[in-house]
Amino acid sequence: MIFHLQEEITEGHEVYKAWFEAEAIPQIEAAGGGCLGCGVDAENENILHLVMETPSMDVVEAFMGSEDFTKARQSAGVLVETTQITVLKQ
C-alpha cells in the first residue's frame, strides 16, 4: 500500500530528517515498509510531504496510534494535529 502523508513541521526539515532517518526509518522497515520520497513544499518549508509504502493500513494505524512514536514525532517538530494521510491507488 502506498500513501502520501502531509504535515506541518516547526523545527525545520533538517531536524525532522535527522530523526526520521535515524529512528523512524528503521522502525518502518522492520514493519515491512519504506519511504519512497521525503521533502518539504517548495513554497512553504514548514509543510512536509512523505510518500511511504507499507504492507497494509494496519501498519500505518499502529504507528499513528503509538504514544511513543507520536511523542518522538512531536520532539522532531511535527504538529501531529496537522497530519493528513492519502492512500494512493496504483
Predicted features by range, described:
Residues 1-65, 82-90:
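Short S/T/G/P-rich N-terminal loop/turn motif that feeds into the first structured element of a domain
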